[in-house]
Every structure is written in structure tokens, then in C-alpha cells.
Amino acid sequence: MATTIPFDFRSHCVQLLAQAVKQVLPEETEIHIELQRPKQMDHGDYSTNLAMKLAKRLRRNPLELAKVLIGALPDSPYVGKTVVAGGGFVNFFLKKTAKQQFLLTVLQAADSFGHSKLGAGKTIQIEFVSANPTGPLHVGHGRGAAFGASLANIMAAAGYAVTREFYVNDAGRQMDILALSTWLRYLDLCGIALPFPSNAYQGRYVVDMALEIHRIHGDRYAHYSDSPTQQLAEINAKAAADGEDEYLDNLITAAKSILGEDYAYLHNFVLTEQLNDCRNDLMEFGVEFENWFSEQSLFDSGMVARAVQLLDDKKLLYRQDGALWFQSTGFGDEKDRVVQRENGQYTYFASDIAYHLSKYERGFDYMLNIWGADHHGYISRVKGAIEALSLDSDKLEIALVQFAVLYRDGNKISMSTRSGEFVTLRQLRQEVGNDAARFFYVLRKSDQHLDFDLDLAKSQSNDNPVYYVQYAHARICSVLEQWGGAVDIFGRAETELLTNPAELVLLQKIIDFPDTIEAAAKEHAPHLIAFFLRELASEFHSYYNSTRFLIPDEALKIARLALISAVCQVLSKGLSLLGVTSPRKM
């Protein structure tokens, strides 16, 4: 009767070690066993420094303890031998037959191969992108989108129940600035030319929204009993005496006064236009969310007032200069923070406290915020507020994503969001394609700067990592198409014929795939999947260039085709986790 091969050899070896420790060191009831993949294949398949760690604590010789542990290891149908190496490492060597037979398990598992029960069904909310709906998404947002979407896929594959959330900043000053910017462009279309503030939104999309409003409503929002020309001219006349922010705020106040109830229409129009554009852009990029959470809803529901009241009930607020301050220095922040201004308006920080209170009250087991690196200073105050509310701050993690710098012809492309001089995510996607954008964005750790070479991303060469990986997939599909047989036969493949060193390397890479997904989930590191795919593609291309597949020896042919079919399956799964397609032809 055939033995069922476990999906996870690593876990099997960990269990063997745990049983050995229980036998020879029964007093060691709390141990953490880690296995690493040795850098050199001749050092085994897995290695652990457990004996060295235990020896240090128990004041024993690590080499002797390693030998004792090996002697206590139960027999295994999958482990060929274990040896002591170096200063006390225990190295495991899997049986060649175990690796060969594992291939059949991979093929049988199909798309579920690589999945694990790491998350055990626990819920995790991943909030990412959350860009202000004040203009098109730019390439910086694109990196956060690719990172967040890929990580969400990886966490789901690792057994977590994932909720993807976009926090819509639809309340506050930035939306007012966009509404004002659009109205001023609209007035210009109506023949009312007024100075346009340098710190208003400058992009072409503002003019486009003004044109759409004018197309629908004509001059309706230009003629009021209170003349826009007179009021705004008075504000412009003393603009030099005011600071830029005060000048802009005065214009916003005047716009609200002049437009009256019509201001709400203008505000909602620009919000809807930009939010729809954002949704469509992300959807085309393969990034979707279960929930779009409105900041304004926190005010409408009274959640902001309730969050502030909870802090007040804990006597953690005080008044100074007419404003209400949170004693955040008592919770690790560098200074106390205002939650309510002198004019009674709540600050952005107050709504952020309420938003995180909402997350906790929704009952997620874990929460992950993915923020731009420019929000680094915001972490301590948010964590402080969570602790002040007596919530478990360990449930919340915050990952930072550095900006992506674009290069064309070796030259850096300069960008400025407010002035409208930036490359949008849509422009990037149109130039290099979704696949290249998604893959390139996760080639580095999220907290590392990313240099995005547009020319490389468009090239069809082995230097282009996404092309290199996709080409491996297409090559395999081509071989299988030339063969033209039924893949069901692979389940009866004589895998013991796969003895070529290149074949054993490919088998080992396939075995590593579930471990790679788990590591990427634990470390919040999609780049580990990208690295793995490049390595697997490289090993396959070498194998392809040195091996014939459609050969007279039927048994060996089927075994080799089964192997590359499994490689194809893993490449496709890995690419899908990163939101990248797997073309059958290139």
C-alpha cells in the first residue's frame, strides 16, 4: 500500500525533533524548533541549531547533545539520514524516493498545493492604499496597492480569513481644497477669471471635472446674489498678508458661504468622480476590496465623539489654548496631540482614533495597516491611542511602504503630487503592463526604496524578471502542447526515474514552495515569492536547455513531463499570488 507523503517535510522533521527532546530532555516542555534550508545541498535538506541553543542553557556540550538528539529520533519513511555538523547543527537528509514520490502529491493537490493551515481560520483585516480621493492614484500608491493585494493573497493561502479594506478619507480639509480647486476652474469656464492658488490642486483632472459640471449645469454655480467675483477678489487682495494655508482656508470659507447648499453638491460630485476613478484604476490593476470604509461615517455615526469621550472618561484629555489635547506622551509619543481644535472641529487624529476603535469593535483577530513611509511618525501616536483605550496593541501591526522612483533611459523621473507633475498608476500600467507593474513593485522589501526601471520592465529579455518567469511557464506549456497527451497519465508517472541532478534540484524547489508561502505570510514579505519564482524559473531554464523531453523512452518521457507540469503549476500559483498572469504563449 502506497504511503501518503506529507505536504510539509519541514513540519515532519520538527515533529521528529520534538519527540526526541521529549524522550531525552522531558523537563524541556517549552521549546521552539526552527529548521533552515542549508545554503549548500550537500549539507542536507533541513538544518537546526536546536542542540546548540539547548546546550547553552543546560551547560552541556552542543556536539554531544546533538548526537544524543539524533540517537533519539524516531524512524521516518521520509528521512534518509541525520548528521551532526559544525558546532552542533543537526542536518536532515530526505530520502530521494520521498522527494520523487512527493511530485505525485503536488500534481494531485493542483491549485491548492502550497496552501497551509498557519492562520487556522483566524481573521485579519488588511487596510491598504487608502489614498485621499483628491486626484488620480500615482505610482507611489501603486506600490502600496501591489504589496497589499499580494500580501492579502498570501495570507489567504496561509489559512487566514482576510478582509481587504480601503479607508476613504472623504472628510476634512483636503476634500474642501479639491472642491474649491474645481469650482475656481469652473468659474473660469463661466468667464469669471480669478487667481488660482499655488497650493490648490493643479492637475488636468481638476479642469476635466469642471468641464463636466459646466456641461451638465452650464453657469448655474457661477451666479449668486453674493457675487463670487467681489468676495473672492477681496480675499485675493489681501492674500499676500496671509499665509498660504490661511489664504486657502479663507477661499474655502467664502466658497461655502457663496454656494450655500450647492456646496454639498460640488463636494459630493468631486468625491464621487475621484472615488470611482480610484476604484476602476485599482480594479483594472487586479486590486479589489471587500470594504470601502468612509471617514465621514465616523462623524455621522458619532464614533469620533464617542472615541474622544472614552479618552476623556479615562482623564487623558486636557484643555489648553481653547483646544482639547490627548496626553499621548504618556504612551510613547514625542508630544501631546490635539483631538479637537479651538473652533470645535475634530482633528484628523481624532477620526483616526475612532477608525481604529471601529476596527477593534468589529472583532478581527489581527489587523495590518499598510502605510506610506512618510507616515512613520504617526505610528507611535496611533499605538498610544490604542493602548490608552485599553485595547490590545499587539493585534495591530503597521507595515511601511517606501516610495517607488521611476527611471527612463537611466534618468530619474521627478514628480510633485500637488503641482500635478506626477506619473499616475494608470499611465504606468499603460506603459509597462499590469503584470510587469505588479511584479516589479514586490521585488524588494516594502520598507526598502524601489528603483523602477521602465525600460527593463518593457524588455523581452532574461534580465526582465517577470518576463523570465512567465517565459518559463510558456515554455512548459509549449512542450506539453507538442506532446498532446492526457495529463491524467502523470498520476502514474515512474518518478524514481528522475535521478538527474537538475531534476532533483527542481523537486527540491517544488518542495520548498509551501515553506516559502508560510515565510512570506509570517514576515509580511511578498518579495520572498518573487525571489522564489525567479530561482525556480532559472533552474527550469537550465534544465530545459540541457534536456530532451519528447523522447522514445515512454516511462522517462512521462516522468519528465510530470515534473515540468508540476513546475508549471507552481509557477502559475506563485504568479497568481502576486496578481500576475501566466501566459501559455509568448
Swiss-Prot record:
<dbReference type="InterPro" id="IPR001412">
    <property type="entry name" value="aa-tRNA-synth_I_CS"/>
</dbReference>
<dbReference type="GO" id="GO:0004814">
    <property type="term" value="F:arginine-tRNA ligase activity"/>
</dbReference>
<keyword id="KW-0030">Aminoacyl-tRNA synthetase</keyword>
<keyword id="KW-0648">Protein biosynthesis</keyword>
<protein>
    <recommendedName>
        <fullName>Arginine--tRNA ligase</fullName>
        <ecNumber>6.1.1.19</ecNumber>
    </recommendedName>
</protein>
<comment type="similarity">
    <text>Belongs to the class-I aminoacyl-tRNA synthetase family.</text>
</comment>
<dbReference type="Pfam" id="PF00750">
    <property type="entry name" value="tRNA-synt_1d"/>
</dbReference>
<dbReference type="InterPro" id="IPR014729">
    <property type="entry name" value="Rossmann-like_a/b/a_fold"/>
</dbReference>
<dbReference type="Pfam" id="PF03485">
    <property type="entry name" value="Arg_tRNA_synt_N"/>
</dbReference>
<dbReference type="InterPro" id="IPR035684">
    <property type="entry name" value="ArgRS_core"/>
</dbReference>
<dbReference type="Pfam" id="PF05746">
    <property type="entry name" value="DALR_1"/>
</dbReference>
<keyword id="KW-0067">ATP-binding</keyword>
<dbReference type="GO" id="GO:0006420">
    <property type="term" value="P:arginyl-tRNA aminoacylation"/>
</dbReference>
<keyword id="KW-0547">Nucleotide-binding</keyword>
<dbReference type="GO" id="GO:0005524">
    <property type="term" value="F:ATP binding"/>
</dbReference>
<dbReference type="GO" id="GO:0005737">
    <property type="term" value="C:cytoplasm"/>
</dbReference>
<keyword id="KW-0963">Cytoplasm</keyword>
<dbReference type="InterPro" id="IPR005148">
    <property type="entry name" value="Arg-tRNA-synth_N"/>
</dbReference>
<comment type="subunit">
    <text>Monomer.</text>
</comment>
<dbReference type="InterPro" id="IPR009080">
    <property type="entry name" value="tRNAsynth_Ia_anticodon-bd"/>
</dbReference>
<dbReference type="InterPro" id="IPR036695">
    <property type="entry name" value="Arg-tRNA-synth_N_sf"/>
</dbReference>
<keyword id="KW-0436">Ligase</keyword>
<dbReference type="InterPro" id="IPR008909">
    <property type="entry name" value="DALR_anticod-bd"/>
</dbReference>
<dbReference type="InterPro" id="IPR001278">
    <property type="entry name" value="Arg-tRNA-ligase"/>
</dbReference>
<feature type="short sequence motif" description="'HIGH' region">
    <location>
        <begin position="131"/>
        <end position="141"/>
    </location>
</feature>
